[in-house]
Structure formats: C-alpha cells, structure tokens
Amino acid sequence: MIFWKTFFQNSTVGESYENNFKKLFLLDKTFDKIELKDVYLSNTKNINLYELEQLCDSVGWVKRPLKKVKIALKHSSIIISLIQKNDSSTRLVGFARATSDNGFNATIWDVVIHPDFQGLGLGKVVMHQLIKQLRQAEISTITLFAEPDVISFYRKLGFIKDPDGVKGMFWYPR
C-alpha cells in the first residue's frame, strides 16, 4: 500500500480545539440571503437526534431508526457539526462523523450539508476538520464511501478512488 505513504507525506499535525464551538471566520459573508457570520463549528457528541434526522431528510437520505443513530453517534470517534446560531434559535446545518480503531484506520460517515448551505465551502470545512483531528490522532488510513455524484468533491480533498486497485467489499445478510 505505497499509496498511503505518499498521500500523507505532506500532512502536518495541527492544534486541537479548546472549546466546543469555534466561529468560522472565513464565513463572515452573505450568500443568497443566508448570513453565515453566525455559523459555528462544534465537536460535541451531544447532537439533537431530531435535528440530525431533519438535516438528513433535507438532502433526501432514507430515514434511519433514531435508536440506531444514537448508538452510531455514541461509538463515533469524532463528530463535527455546523450550527447556525441566531438570537432566538440554533439550527444544525452540517454534520459528519468518523469511526476508528484508534491505531491505524478511520472511516468517515454521514457527511451532510443542508441544501441552503451547499456550494459555500462548508463541506470542505467539515472534512478538513475531520481529517485534521484524525491526523492528530496519528491515523494514517482514512476511508469513506461516496455516492457517484460526490466523488469529484472528495477527489478535490485528496481522496483516491480504488488506490492501487484496492476494492471495498461488503457482506449483507441474505
């Protein structure tokens, strides 16, 4: 697997977050009537399951049992969310998580950005934070599964489809 050696040769370990919320300074602009100056990055595992379900529903994902979603979140190594805060409310507008063996490998799951906020670079922000935190934990192999229509997004972030001819395999109950 020579690929992984070259994939991370220029990677650096960054600083960790001191707080659960960090303001995204790069988003101090207005796009199509959406003010992003109140969007915050969070790494708390305390996610409102109903808000997450609404976010996933907004992009057309199949509903999953909340009980299982809760278990998946509990066993996730890293959770990154984007929260829009106003004077009177908060709203989950982005989310992603990773699971890991905490030694070598991690897989990124459930990358989702609300349609009103897509195309503004928020997916990149979430992915960069996940990768940064995984690299801080000295994880050398980061994988993900992608629908065909988003492969180019992940390629721009440095992910490679089928490196060295490696193929993912799945087992499903019959």
UniProtKB/Swiss-Prot annotation:
Domain N-acetyltransferase span(s) in chain numbering: 42-174
Keywords: Acyltransferase, Chloroplast, Plastid, Transferase
Cell compartments where the protein resides: Plastid, Chloroplast
CDD domains, alphabetized: NAT_SF
GO terms of molecular function: N-acetyltransferase activity
Main localization (coarse): plastid
UniProt cross-references to InterPro entries, sorted A to Z: Acyl_CoA_acyltransferase, GNAT_dom, NSI-like
Class of this enzyme: transferase
Catalytic activity, EC: 2.3.1.-
Cysteine pairs bridged by disulfides in the record: none
Cellular component, GO annotation: chloroplast
Tree of life domain: Eukaryota
Keyword Chloroplast: yes
Gene3D superfamilies in the record: 3.40.630.30
Family, per entry: Belongs to the acetyltransferase family. Ycf52 subfamily.
Protein name, entry field: Uncharacterized N-acetyltransferase ycf52
Source species taxonomy: Eukaryota, Rhodophyta, Bangiophyceae, Bangiales, Bangiaceae
